[in-house]
Amino acid sequence: MPRLDIFQSLWAMDSGRGSHPSASTEESFALVKNAGFAGMAIDLSAADLDAAYKTAPLFRQYELGCVINAYPASMEDVLPVLKMAREFDAVVVNIIAQVVPSSVEEASLMVQDWMEEAEKEDVNIEFETHRNSVTNDLGYTTALLEAVPDMKLSVDLSHYVVDREINLPLRRDETELFDKILRRADAFQGRISSGQQIQLQLEFPQHQKWVVQFLDWWEAGFRYWRKRAPGTGTLIFQTELAPPEYAMTGADGMEMSNRWEESLIMKGWIEDLWKRLEKEEIEATVTVDKEHT
């Protein structure tokens, strides 16, 4: 049966001001392990390779899976990340390519080259939907997916919502574009945005319409993934509630919510959603079996 693994971002464990009690990298690993996460994601925009390598013993000590979020601009940048992925036995490398080619054809050639190199090194890579990257634009990315049918996608919709200044309710053309992305999603990242803010507080009343929208998107994406996934496939969902300046702060510089608590809230939402989909499939199978007996 397909499995859900929820990862927490080490970058999100940056305590900021007033976010959560973690005071060290090791304490962050302990918190994540004790909270029942399957693994931790290293963000190479927040730490260089040397600093990231220092976390290797903690992955072993706390028996957590590893995801690497990388920001290469060339094949020369990709190669050391693939080496690191092998040494960390990373489940996947999320590529946020720091290149924005002018044409889909040019982008598709780059993506295929990087995919081929990763395949040679036996490393699983996915391209994350992210601003200021090869997947910067929603429409451009759907065209790129058509050009590269085997391109794997790690979907963070928060970037497209704020990039396009999306308003609710969605227009039909927006719904169709988001649906194309969700149909190709191989993994998901958890952050909720609006058309004006990249990261919203999860429990503020004024943000609930966006919470509902993102939960609807994640449910649709999960359903698409489960339909095409092998019976032993694993879906990775990464909670990534980032520190300031992603997180909003008041005039005193203090964050307006506790991101660690919000990560646990989001983790609970995703677990509940997954269980509901599993229950639906089991009930549907039982019904079909009864009809054939």
Where do the PLM segments sit?
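Acidic/histidine-rich catalytic cores of soluble enzymes
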Residues: K120-P205
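Charged helix-capping and loop-helix junction motifs
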Residues: S22-S24, L79, E105-D113, L138-G139, ...
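Active-site acidic/histidine proton-transfer and metal-coordination neighborhood
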Residues: G65-L153, V162
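Active-site-proximal loop/turn and secondary-structure-junction residues that shape catalytic pockets
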Residues: L10-A12, L44-A46, P72-S74, A97-P101, ...
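Hydrophobic faces of well-ordered beta-strands that scaffold small-molecule active sites
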Residues: P2-M13, M40-I42, L64-A70, V93-I95, ...
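A short, acidic, amphipathic alpha-helical segment used as a generic capping/interface helix at domain edges
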Residues: D173-E176, W210-T234
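Flexible glycine/acidic-rich beta-alpha junction loops that bind and position SAM and/or redox cofactors
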Residues: S15-G16, V162-E165, I192-H207, G233-D252
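N-terminal pre-domain/capping segments
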Residues: M1-R86, A90, G268-T293
